[in-house]
């Protein structure tokens, strides 16, 4: 679960933007520049993941993949928007809170990674053409089912494959630009 101070900060920010007379101009402007800023945002997410990647990949002792080709196919297909939205929510609400329980250093880095993912989600939501959806993805449901079956090992598996998730985000976004 996101910390209450982070949620409060986001709500105050969003209220300020909504109250602004130029809110739609700001949103349109940021959406115009979003495709150009996406590589930088993904680079930041990758760098944040790099700080915990080795830890989680060393702990992941499973030979199977959690993030499968069917998920990438959903990202590239008509369910891409929903698959992306659900996977961001899955990592923020299910994976990362459990991943933070592996010591203060890991918690700090996972928290930073989560904040960068939240920022990306916020930008995607502001630019409706990138995230205008509500249908459920069967591939995401499969990822969640396997994650839950793996119990504690699911955290290691999901976090060790976070770089694959970043690549899937990039693949989805390139189809939308």
Curated annotation (Swiss-Prot):
Subcellular localization, as worded in the UniProt entry: Secreted
MF GO annotations: cytokine activity; interleukin-10 receptor binding
Pfam families membership: IL10
Keyword annotations from UniProtKB, A to Z: Cytokine, Disulfide bond, Glycoprotein, Secreted, Signal
Domain of life of the source: Eukaryota
Gene3D superfamilies listed in its UniProt record: 1.20.1250.10
Family listed: Belongs to the IL-10 family.
Protein name: Interleukin-10
Native source species: Ovis aries (Sheep)
Originating gene: IL10
């Amino acid at each position: 679960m996101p910390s209450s101070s982070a949620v409060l900060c986001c709500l105050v920010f969003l209220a300020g933007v909504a109250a602004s007379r130029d809110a739609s101009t700001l949103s349109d402007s940021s959406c115009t520049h979003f495709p150009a800023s996406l590589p930088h945002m993904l680079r930041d997410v990758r760098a944040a993941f790099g700080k915990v990647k080795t830890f989680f990949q060393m702990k992941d002792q499973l030979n199977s993949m959690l993030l499968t080709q069917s998920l990438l196919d959903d990202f590239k297909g008509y369910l891409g928007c929903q698959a992306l939205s659900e996977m961001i929510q899955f990592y923020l609400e299910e994976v990362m809170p459990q991943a933070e329980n592996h010591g203060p250093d890991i918690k700090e880095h996972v928290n930073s990674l989560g904040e960068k993912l939240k920022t990306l989600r916020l930008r995607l939501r502001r630019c409706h053409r990138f995230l205008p959806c509500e249908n459920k993805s069967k591939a995401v449901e499969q990822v969640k089912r396997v994650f839950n079956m793996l119990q504690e090992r699911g955290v290691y598996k999901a976090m060790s494959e976070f770089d694959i998730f970043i690549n899937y985000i990039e693949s989805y976004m390139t189809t939308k630009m």
